[in-house]
Structures are given as structure tokens and as C-alpha cells.
Amino acid sequence: MVPVVALVGRPNVGKSTLFNRLTRTRDALVADFPGLTRDRKYGRAEIEGREFICIDTGGIDGTEDGVETRMAEQSLLAIEEADVVLFMVDARAGLMPADEAIAKHLRSREKPTFLVANKTDGLDPDQAVVDFYALGLGEIYPIAASHGRGVLSLLEHVLLPWMEDLAPQEEVDEDAEYWAQFEAEENGEEEEEDDFDPQSLPIKLAIVGRPNVGKSTLTNRILGEERVVVYDMPGTTRDSIYIPMERDGREYVLIDTAGVRKRGKITDAVEKFSVIKTLQAIEDANVVMLVIDAREGISDQDLSLLGFILNSGRSLVIVVNKWDGLSQEVKEQVKETLDFRLGFIDFARVHFISALHGSGVGNLFESVREAYDSSTRRVGTSMLTRIMTMAVEDHQPPLVRGRRVKLKYAHAGGYNPPIVVIHGNQVKDLSDSYKRYLMNYFRKSLDVMGSPIRIQFKEGENPYANKRNTLTPTQMRKRKRLMKHIKKSK
């Protein structure tokens, strides 16, 4: 499960600035959910290939009378949902009563907490943080988030070791594996099949969406249609339920974020605070079903969730629920709105269903299987290079400073989502429009449906870079003869 890091502290201590620093590597959108957590942002970040979800919890305000009375209920829940807390204080303002009250609450939760003193630029860090040792949270990590000072150290010496302890990462030398395959192809040898068979694994399917769009009804309808015995397998995140099931001989694991089996135990506050569980379900899934309410249309919250799904690279099936009972005129209007607002997602299948009555539900799994198969299909280097060559023949890359961009070869860089790595010269100068052309060409040629496809470009190294242009003895003799000839002709 993808770990969650929460940034907490008083207002104006620099939480949002640090949040932007942490998430910039993924260009993360940041999913803003108005109405649920108006002052809270969620984003994806990465440390040395390890992803985590970062939460900016907004300011927790309070006085010496007791900060707990001022804490927003959802901020407390954010701390509960997080795996680790970065407690931020303002080194310039010094120790405040609100800091002490927040620290007291964090100590009572026994949650892994790291104390981060921000705004230390221009100060002696050792002197600036002395007072904060009174909070009893151990070592203090001074940073200047606005300038980036100390942030890298915070990542490398605090978050990374903690994440390694949480889930050690298996190291795979992907470059060595690729070059071994490439060399084998050059020598005319067969590509060796690896042991990975995606068809033998269950498809992890997450059903996500806003509250009250019919996620629970759809989950119950799917399980009811199957007539199989299911059991709850609680995940590491509270109230997320993993439900194994089988359909048409294929195994699935339904990831239900609505807590349908523990509904009676969930308070209204926890039910509303489903954002963390939803984001973790997306990260953990192979295919995501985004459920939209046909009567309410596409909301900003739907688009935020959609942005997170796309950034995660997950396969996608869009489900428009509550389709029954709508007039033909309203249905046409809904379809026009979908085309207008979701036109940029041309790879995802859209289904119109009624989870309550079961109409259209049976067709969903065909699209789920198609999306999963597209995202996990293995394609060889020779095939990808051939497709790239055909794309270049159909539409030449643009000229850059009078020289044509040269694409040399392509190979697979990963799966789920499919990643195509293209090597060439001056590829960094390719326009966005040509990159989109290549992406669409690969999608059409490989018949990828239901899954995003990503293309990465790698610049070829110039073997003569930083080398002096020294002539060989033969070249020197030719040059002398040429100069003599030129002088005679004059």
C-alpha cells in the first residue's frame, strides 16, 4: 500500500511551500476537494523511485486554552490516516503555545512523527531550534522550504529510511536487462520469455467516485450477480476492504473504498473523509472504475480524481450511473457534456448503467479485461522500433536549428501503464504536438484501449563531445597536398 505523509502545524509555518517542494517531482496535481476538505490538498511525490501520498492539512489554529478545541475534525482524521507525520514549526516565531498543544496530541497518538523547523534561512539553525526540544519529539530537522535548503536532507535522512523500513524495495537493474535483450536481438538470438504472466494474477479493480454516486450499490450488484462466497480481507488502510471474486473464469480483487461491510461502524465524519482511502485504492489497483452520477454531471471533484488516476498511470473505465429514468433529451445532454469535458480521455471506455436495477453492469468486465490486457501486454524491441520507423516515415520530425531530429530505436520501459522509451538525437527539442502524434501512433498500432500510454525520450551521447579535433597523420598529408593544390591554382 502506498504510504501517506501528513504535514501538520500552525497556519503560516510553510506547510504548503514544503508540499509544493515534495510533489514537484511528479508535477503532481494536486487534488483539491471542495466541500469535503476545502483547505486541504493531496499530491503524489517520489523519493528515489518510491512513491507516497502527501497531505497538506491546512493550518491547525489554537491558543493556550487548548488547541484540541480548535482542531478541525478532518485534520485529526488526516493524522489518523497518515503513516507518518511531519510536524512543522516556525523557527522565526519561536515556540508557541499552539505548538505545544499539537505536540501533546501527536505524542498521544504514538504516530511516527518528525519535527521540522522551517524558515531557518538567515538564522543560526542550532540556535533557532533550541526551544523546540521542549516539545519532546526528539531530533529537529531545520529547513528553509521557500529556498529548498535542507529539504533534500529531510528526504534522504528521514523519509527515505522510514519508507525502506516500511517496505524494502527489490532492486532490479532494468538497463542491464534491456541491453542484454538488445544484444541478443542484434546477434539474431530469440528473446527469452520471463516468468511473469499477468494472466495468472487476479485483476485488482478499484471502484472510486464521489460520495453518493452509487459505488456501494455497484459493488453489491457485482457481488450479487456472481453468486459466489466472498470474504473480507482488510487492507493496511482502515475501512478499505479487499473482496476476492471470480467472473468468467478470471479472478478479481474488488477494492471497495466505501466500507460497505462496515457501514454501521463508520461515523459520518469518517464516511466523509474518504479521500485518503480512495487515493490509496487508485495506487494499489490495476484498473480503476470511476463512477459518475448522470443526474449531477461532471463535477470539479470528478476531474480532480480523474487527474490523480491519470497521474498514477492506472487503466480506466468510466461508469455513468443512475442512467435509468432519464428522458432521451436529458441523456443526449449528458453525453454532450461528457464529450466536452472528457474529450481529452479518448482511450477510456464509457458505460452507461443503472447499478440499482443492474442494467449495463454485465458489460463492464469486458472493458476491465481489455484495459488490463492492454496495460500488461509484452511488446518486443523490434516491434516497437518498427512502429517508430513507420511513424517517422508517415510524418517526419521537425527541423531543429536546421537539423532533423533523428529517432534511432525504441524499447519497452515498463508496464501498467505501458512505457515506450525512444532513443535519438535532439529528442529533447521535439515539440509537444509531435510527442502527442507519436503517442497516438503507438496507441493505434498496438491497439491499446483503456490504458494510458507513456513515451519517454533519451538523448544519445555524442562520442566526440569534449574531444579535440586532432588530425591523423594521413589527414595531415592530405591537407598539405590540398593546400599546395590551392596555392598553385591561384
UniProtKB/Swiss-Prot annotation:
Domain EngA-type G, chain residue ranges per copy: 3-166, 203-376
Q: Which family does it belong to?
A: Belongs to the TRAFAC class TrmE-Era-EngA-EngB-Septin-like GTPase superfamily. EngA (Der) GTPase family.
Any idea which positions bind GTP 1? 9-16, 56-60, 118-121
**Which organism was this protein described from?**
Escherichia coli O127:H6 (strain E2348/69 / EPEC)
Which InterPro entries does the record associate with it? Answer: G_ENGA (IPR031166), GTP-bd (IPR006073), GTPase_Der (IPR016484), KH_dom-like (IPR032859), KH_dom-like_a/b (IPR015946), P-loop_NTPase (IPR027417), Small_GTP-bd (IPR005225)
Q: Which CDD domains match?
A: EngA1 (cd01894), EngA2 (cd01895)
GO biological process terms, alphabetically, are: ribosome biogenesis
Output the PANTHER family linked to this UniProt entry: GTPASE DER
Could you tell me what this protein is called?
GTPase Der
Keyword Transferase annotated: no
Question: How does this chain assemble?
Answer: Associates with the 50S ribosomal subunit.
Q: Which Gene3D superfamilies match?
A: 3.30.300.20, P-loop containing nucleotide triphosphate hydrolases (3.40.50.300)
Disulfide bond annotation, renumbered to this chain? none
